[in-house]
From Swiss-Prot:
Residues that hold Mg(2+) according to the record: 332, 338, 341-342
Signal peptide: none
Gene symbol of the encoding locus: pheT
SUPFAM superfamilies reported for this sequence: Class II aaRS and biotin synthetases, PheT/TilS domain, Putative DNA-binding domain
Reactions catalysed: tRNA(Phe) + L-phenylalanine + ATP = L-phenylalanyl-tRNA(Phe) + AMP + diphosphate + H(+)
UniProt record similarity statement: Belongs to the phenylalanyl-tRNA synthetase beta subunit family. Type 2 subfamily.
GO BP terms, alphabetized: phenylalanyl-tRNA aminoacylation
Keyword terms, alphabetized: Aminoacyl-tRNA synthetase, ATP-binding, Cytoplasm, Ligase, Magnesium, Metal-binding, Nucleotide-binding, Protein biosynthesis
Gene Ontology cellular-component terms listed: phenylalanine-tRNA ligase complex
Annotated EC: 6.1.1.20
Organism: Pyrococcus furiosus (strain ATCC 43587 / DSM 3638 / JCM 8422 / Vc1)
Superkingdom per UniProt: Archaea
Protein name: Phenylalanine--tRNA ligase beta subunit
Amino acid sequence: MPKFDVAKSDLERLVGREFSVEEWEDLVLYAKCELDDVWEEDGKIYFKLDSKDTNRPDLWSAEGVARQIRWALGLAKGLPKYEVEESDVVVYVDKKLRNIRPYGVYAVVEGLKLDEEALSQLIQLQEKVALTYGRRRREVAIGIFDFDKVKPPIYYRAAEKTEKFVPLGYSEEMTLEEILEKHEKGREYGHLIRDKPYYPLLVDSEGNVLSMPPIINSELTGRVTTETKNVFVDVTGWDLRKVMLALNVIVTALAERGGKIKRVKVIYPDFEITTPDLTPKEFEVSFEYIRKLSGLELSNEEIKELLERMMYEVEILSENKAKVKYPAFRDDIMHTRDVLEDVLIAYGYNNIDPEEPKLAVQGRGDPFKDFEDAIRDLMVGFGLQEVMTFNLTSKEVQFDKMNIPEEEIVEIANPISSRWSALRKWLLPSLMEFLSNNTHEEYPQRIFEVGLATLIDESRETKTVSEPKLAVALAGSGYTFTNAKEILDSLMRHLGIEYDIEETVHGSFIPGRVGKILVDGKEIGIIGEIHPQVLENWNIQVPVVAFEIFLKPLYR
């Protein structure tokens, strides 16, 4: 969750009232924040606020928090009103950017009076929105420039990698390629554009570079100080809806500082738009739904009043229906439940009387979990040690290192690391990885795991099913197929289940020393001696025998 710093005095200046630290601890709850830390520096009190909502970037700065609190306290109500004036600024977007970084939206904000606190909040908000909402600048990157140094019209264009400009914080020109290699921000975010045929560049009519989205601003225009009065805001990314929202968050925060927002015309190859668009969004809600889910006997007028304290404009359509309008810097309203949450925040969770749940039954353990625990106890009784490995894995671990062809598995869309890019289909690779990481320990090593494997199942709503499995691996000199079968025999005998082993072929096991495990004629697992190639892949120097079975067919 985003955390950000604010000065107590700055918050109070924006709210228009002073409060004690203890009072602030309660007030920030209206802005879906918690007071994480308090400290004093240079005679000022500072707060570290911990936002509890990743879908509300408008609440990640002093301006947004103060605005929310003003409304919650009744100092203002209904929709916030921001006057947006026309300007003659035009930005032209190059069609070559379509598959590089296609969307840019812009605004001008004039008449700012930025002190150190205001400037700090602007920079912090810019970074937090790009980091969290913008997924580390992949989907949203923000640039803010001294507009007095910019000569419109402006061009968002594709540039050759050999073009040069002076990046922020430097005094000498660098090529775009050099910026990716040498500049701190280039090394951090260069992967977002490095493999593209061109790099994005924002330049004015005189050819002066404003920025290289999403990497770095220029030293000429990209340094905003307390002397800056007028700014040009640039937001780029892949999703027009997301970049529009980010722009709205930034410009309305600046408007809270007294800035005057001006529109910019953005001309794309096949359409044009004017930004920012602060037109309120609309949604219909049911009063009865709000009463039912909240458990509160609120009248329609009371619900209307609570919503107006959360920056909604409410039009009652009937006894049970209302049309609500909410600010353009929000994009988190998708269901009446989202509106209900705001009703409860305004009402105050602490004002809701707790009730003891009326349960018709007594709680008890899940019988299948008891069965899994019994399996664990048996394995420990057989002299095995339990390990617990991660469900997240990779195709390399699941297939390549196990010497088998790649199959379809559940993959993560945007993994942080390729090592954790999929959900495992079977447990044995995890045990092999464990053995590989413990080759320095004494042998024999006898381990097992009871865990979930995730399989593709097109018949289900989620297209997947998670199946509980048992995997056993024995590592040490002298271990053979017989040793693994002895443990399997003992397990089945304790469970009172008859089973058969039928010879099969499997790339992870030695041919002729591998079999599929059958119960009632259905395959439930596999057993065998691990193939030498697999041992080599995992850098294991001793024989390994193993088996893996589904547990649900054994649950009687």
